[in-house]
Amino acid sequence: MVINSIINKKKIPLYGNGKNIREWIYVDDFINAIEFLIKKAIPNQTFLIGSGYAEKNIDLINKIIKIIKKETEFKIEKNLIKYVKDRAGHDRVYKINSNKIRKLGWKHKIQLNDGLLKTIKHYI
């Protein structure tokens, strides 16, 4: 949504003050984790898949903007962010404990900034 908003020169909606924290994982890492678990064939178990990269939403948006400015010739408008009222009871942090899958030997491969760059290049 952030990249599409930038491409289409639309405001990026950011809930609350932007300091909510979310964990991020590159899609290829997520797929690799699913394939890893299928091959392990462990029945009746639940596994949480995560990268361990947790960022404030505002920081992630700023990273995306910085990468687009550095890696592309795309012109970025000023004042891109539109702060939106947060919903009542919105969780401040979404971060998981993926130790269970890590103990089996799985680990993400794509670093956050590398994943952001790959995603941006896909869209632009």
Language-model features, listed with the residues they occupy:
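C-terminal substrate-binding subdomain of Rossmann-fold SDR/epimerase-dehydratase oxidoreductases
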Residues: 3-124
